[in-house]
């Protein structure tokens, strides 16, 4: 059974599943759907079209599904879609998409979005990601599974952050970050691979050694991207995990962080 505080404002067209909780002074607008077991704290604003999955927790003063400030936006009915088991901490802002891109901002499952972070329009966040306090993603940003963006990380529009990547505090990212890579600084510079995070996720020493070799091929041998891709082919044949690194470089439209 849902638990709706009498001081909350729920639009009649909103759809709330069983077990949803909505705290005082929160507003759930039209064309919002909230899945089973999701908890909406006090002073939260949810604006549609927005679909929120199961067992999420959204803390106070967050604004989810607001119109994008993109000046091309003219009120089209774009979407925000959030998966399951996400934690959205205090003061987070997540905007809906634009018709110039996917018309949708997407958040996967099991993500932690910490206080005052911002996710811009048309961005795509994978699963098991962490955006630490005050991290800000511009529009059209893609963040791969298990990526961690430390506090005050800034990401330029259209950048792609690869799976398992890591950014240090205050990093300003203007180019794509390949999978597994750790970046620091303003502007961002590649420092290593996220070996500590990979160990915690069960990557074997043999695979870590292969990824270290892959990193050196791309970042330490003075090769062009095309030359590095050819050298990585041999490693990919032995270690499928290297393919994720290789593909994130090969598919980069903005160029990779060096």
From Swiss-Prot:
Single GO MF annotation: acyl-[acyl-carrier-protein]-UDP-N-acetylglucosamine O-acyltransferase activity
Regions annotated as coiled coil: none
EC number: 2.3.1.129
Gene3D superfamilies for the chain: Hexapeptide repeat proteins, Udp N-acetylglucosamine O-acyltransferase, C-terminal domain
Keyword Cell membrane assigned: no
Swiss-Prot/TrEMBL GO biological process terms: lipid A biosynthetic process
Name of the protein: Acyl-[acyl-carrier-protein]--UDP-N-acetylglucosamine O-acyltransferase
Upper taxonomic lineage: Bacteria, Pseudomonadati, Pseudomonadota, Gammaproteobacteria, Pseudomonadales
